[in-house]
Amino acid sequence: MLDDRARLLLKALVERYIADGQPVGSRTLSRASGLELSPATIRNVMSDLEELGLIVSPHTSAGRIPTARGYRLFVDTMLTTQRDQLSAGHITAPRLAPDQPQKVISNAAHMLSSLSQFVGVVMAPRRTSVFRHIEFLRLSEKRFLVIIVSPDGDVQNRVIFTEADYTQSQLIEASNFLNSHYAGMAIEEVRERLQNEVEALRGEIATLMQAAVQVSSEAIESRDEVVVSGERNLLAVSDFSSDMGNLRKLFDLFEQKAQLMRLLDVSSRAEGVRIYIGGESQVIPYQELSVVTAPYEVDGQVVGTLGVIGPMRMPYEKMIQIVDITSKLVSTALSHSK
C-alpha cells in the first residue's frame, strides 16, 4: 500500500512520461509533483516504487519510466477524467451515417483512429446467416454465379459448379422460389425446409437451390468481422517506430484479425470501458501495447465492441472518453437505423 506521498510522485511520474516520453529524473519529478521534497527524499521514494515493480530505470538513463504494473495502478486509482474536455457534441454524430449501418462501423473505426491518433478497431455486429434476396446468372455450362444480398444491403458473389446444366429460365424459377418462400429466414432454417420439401421440387432444381443455400451461408459468415483503421498512425509513435520487427508483428496482427476478434469478443461480455495494459489480455501477445475497449448496443442488447489500440504510453483519460462516447454514438446510430 502506497502512502500519499508515493502515490503523488507515481502519478506525477506517469503523467510526465506519457506527456513527453522521456525517463523522469528526481529534479523533474520534484517540479512536476509540486511537493517540496529534497532530491534525496524523492530518490528514496523512487527506489521504493522500483522495488514494488511500479517503475523501472532504463539502462541508458538515470530517470525512471512506468512499468505495466505502474500504469495499471495509475489507471485504476489515479485517473481524473475531465468530462468537459470531450463531449458527444465534440464527436459529431452525423459522421456516423445512421441511415447506413455498414458505414456506421467503418466511420466509427476511422473516427477512433482520427481522434486518438492510434489504431481504431470495431467488431461488426454479430451476423446471423440470413439472406434478403438471391439471384442466379449462367456463366457457362454447369457454371453459375450466385448473387446474395444480405439484410443490411451487402452484396456477395459466389461461383458454383453443378453436375447438371440449367437454362436461364430454370435459374429464374429457382431464385423466385427461394425469394418468395425463404427471404429473411435464417440459412439453417432454409436448409431444413428445403430438405423436407425436396420431394415436392424437381430434383435438379432442388440440388441447385441446396448448393446456393450453402454458398450463401459461407458468403455471409466469411465477411470481415473486424474493421481496422489508422494502422499507419503507429509509424509516428516513437515507442514502435524504432523497432521494425515489432512493427511488422503489429501489422500482421491487424491484417490477420483473428487475435483482435478474440479480444473484442471477450470485451463485449464486460460492462463499460475496459483497459488492457501490456500483456494483460493474454490474447494479444505484445507487452508494449495497451487496448481500450467498450461494447456497443442495438436496442439495449450488446452486439459488438470497439476500441483504440496504441502504446502503453497513451493518454488514458482521453482514450477512455473517446472510446466511451464513440460506443454511445454507435449504439444510438445503429438503433435508429433499424
Swiss-Prot record:
Keywords: Repressor, Stress response, Transcription, Transcription regulation. It holds the Pfam family HrcA_DNA-bdg. GO terms for biological process: negative regulation of DNA-templated transcription. Signal peptide: none annotated. The keyword Repressor applies. GO terms for molecular function: DNA binding. InterPro entries: GAF-like_dom_sf (IPR029016), HrcA (IPR002571), HrcA_C (IPR021153), WH-like_DNA-bd_sf (IPR036388), WH_DNA-bd_sf (IPR036390), WHTH_HrcA_DNA-bd (IPR005104), WHTH_transcript_rep_HrcA_IDD (IPR023120). HAMAP family: HrcA. Negative regulator of class I heat shock genes (grpE-dnaK-dnaJ and groELS operons). Prevents heat-shock induction of these operons. Belongs to the HrcA family. This is Heat-inducible transcription repressor HrcA. The lineage of its organism: Bacteria, Pseudomonadati, Pseudomonadota, Betaproteobacteria, Burkholderiales. The gene is hrcA.
